[in-house]
């Protein structure tokens, strides 16, 4: 689970990438393992690693992202800094998504 994700991140770092891409890195993990992977990614962000991350982990996105891009049906619906995206989204679809995700 989480250890495999961390090993995959470490292997990727061996290639000295300028950008790392993550596609739902926590989706298949047990809840207890999610924080381990997110902590590793937060560490990368703190070291200045550029990351493009597809995630439903809204707390992580709010904390780490410079920009949040919300997509629906393969289209960009909204793009904004986290402070604006989470506090005052423009698009109704974004508002609906956030109300459903952040209500729990």
Task: Describe these PLM feature segments.
Residues 9:
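Hydrophobic anchor residue at the start of the ABC signature
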Residues 15:
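Conserved signature/switch motifs of ABC ATPase nucleotide-binding domains
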Residues 20-23:
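Catalytic Walker B motif of ABC-type/P-loop ATPase nucleotide-binding domains
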Residues 31-33:
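Helix N-cap at the start of a conserved alpha-helix in ABC-type nucleotide-binding domains
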Residues 35-47:
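Helical segment within the ABC ATPase nucleotide-binding domain
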Residues 55-56:
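H-loop/switch region of ABC-family ATPase nucleotide-binding domains
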Residues 61-63:
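A short, surface-exposed alpha-helical micro-motif characterized by mixed small hydrophobic
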